[in-house]
């Protein structure tokens, strides 16, 4: 049995072997496969493909050659890896949607934006593009170093001359071991302008460079949102750039719209993007899309059409598509490249500095090469001049020599010529002895002397060499530069907020006594005449009822003030939209209320930063406070203190004011005080406040509102038993803050205590809610106007154990006058309550919730006649009461 060759077996620790082998592998991937060189922006495989094309003479003016021939030559000579990796790299360089400036001119199927693969290499053909010649220009003039190929039988370039900044022009991406690179493409004109600026000012800042280089310029065009991501990437080498499709909303007749996408983000697969949209529509995550089709063609370019339903908001759908599909995506910049053979994270300026230094080296080495060649030629011409001056002696010497070697030696010795000069004389043809040829040699020699002087001047002065680099870059810019494709949109577009995805519409937010909250479109409720039955606004739990109601836009802010003096904030759209009969969700699921905390007031505000608005607070014990609205612009999720007060007190209401109004405070025993808001000094957010009204025993504040000085507004009073009236504000004289107030209604067993005191103009509608959850909407103008001491008229006939819980005013709409028979539909629920719905309101003014109680009425004619008679008797009683008061 033969013995094993022991000398070939080396025992090693497996840990050391794994460490060293993996390190060798990692360095091989990093240096020789995955990362581009900072000088020419190419990985080895791309560099070898382009050099192979150049060696095979596949220039733009020559015919196409089979891709298989190119791949085979590159694989056999320079790249000892699979043919598929070489072909895929070449295909990518030929795709105008992958490379901003394609380096390969492909003929045949080279793939598409839909992710279709290229045809097999035996079917496609390729050659270099014109701009590729600039990467290879002067490669044979000793401008770069050549190295041995993998088997030592060929030579290949270690880097290309790269006469334009290809690293940034076409970008690069690659995954190495422990690192990755992702560099976006840029516009060639901007890049060269940036290099020129850098060459003139080496201390230029990145901000100044960005005046020339606006940002990435993707081959698929599209939009870039904002410059903050670009600036961060240029300054640090890392950053995220938001890309967005270019889409327009077009009218398609019949009041319908469609979204047309004409440009998509870089590296987005169009087919998958369309599939994603279809999936979202199928899963009902995006509503309102009726049709989706791809109309892309060579004639129209990219064109994806999304038809929108007639009643849908196309802008909101588009914003949802941006957020949930690749119509908007980000490009993660990670500018890692090989610098002196080592991977390094570089910023924009460093990339341009390294490129500029490379160009200076290329031009310097080319100049040195040209100088050597020029001097060699001048040396030969000097020998020829000597020969022409001594032609007879030269001929005689040659004729006397027995061999070429003897003739060469004789010429060198006799005429002091070098070996090269002697050889050139021996190689000279007889026709060059003519006078014309003599003149040509003399002219060429003189030109060479001038050329040599120019080359030496370039090498002697760095600024002259730099100017030559500038001139050549300018020439390339003028030949190949083009307009920017990608538009950079400025101004807060980095991220889509939730608000951008929500249609702006008028809504009603209701809050029940047991703290259930929900929102509904304001069109859910329609106007009815005074005494109407009402619309079922919610199905409440046993002993629960609507206690707060406010109208606003989905994009407005809602401030929630609690009885404990705290404030919370939500956007209108953050309150869940539920059905009209739904009870809502627990308010603690929307805002983080503390124990025993109840919402006392909801206020809708458009601009929390306003310096012209104030909030006025009133507590049950008659304390008031005025504070600037801007103090409440930053409210945390868990709320903040809005007002401080004693333990036996609580917050009753808050009102939004302009700072120049009159304050009205009403009590349950029908006292009302009116005083100027200016008498309230603005206090901080957490301040306690001052006395607003002096209360009688057993009395408490139930209402707070504001009125303009000398206004024609009226005070609306509603009692718990469903009675109400209007009284001009001017019937209530101005008094000093802290007084007891004056009488605003006569309290009887029929009326009950006051539950609502607010101001109206007579042009509003009134939303009235009962503890049974019934909501009615009526015109304020239908409510009788009476004196201060009057009891009021019946607004709603309440059932047993019913009382008014909430009253809120909303903007009157002309559509409210539409005939009910034409516009409304009604159904009767199991409990006999009529439920009606009609789209009539477009309320643009956020309303204030009013801390009060509700209303109901009859439908048949007999009940209507009874109601009229009751109103007449009410007025008679009021007149009698007024006469008694005057006496």
UniProtKB/Swiss-Prot annotation:
Q: What is its EC number?
A: 5.6.2.2
Q: Which gene encodes it?
A: gyrA
Top-rank taxon = Bacteria
Chain ranges of the Topo IIA-type catalytic domain: 35-501
Q: What does the record note on quaternary structure? A: Heterotetramer, composed of two GyrA and two GyrB chains. In the heterotetramer, GyrA contains the active site tyrosine that forms a transient covalent intermediate with DNA, while GyrB binds cofactors and catalyzes ATP hydrolysis.
- Which protein is depicted? DNA gyrase subunit A
Q: Which Pfam families match?
A: DNA_gyraseA_C, DNA_topoisoIV
Give the location in the cell: Cytoplasm
Q: Supply any other comment.
A: Few gyrases are as efficient as E.coli at forming negative supercoils. Not all organisms have 2 type II topoisomerases; in organisms with a single type II topoisomerase this enzyme also has to decatenate newly replicated chromosomes.
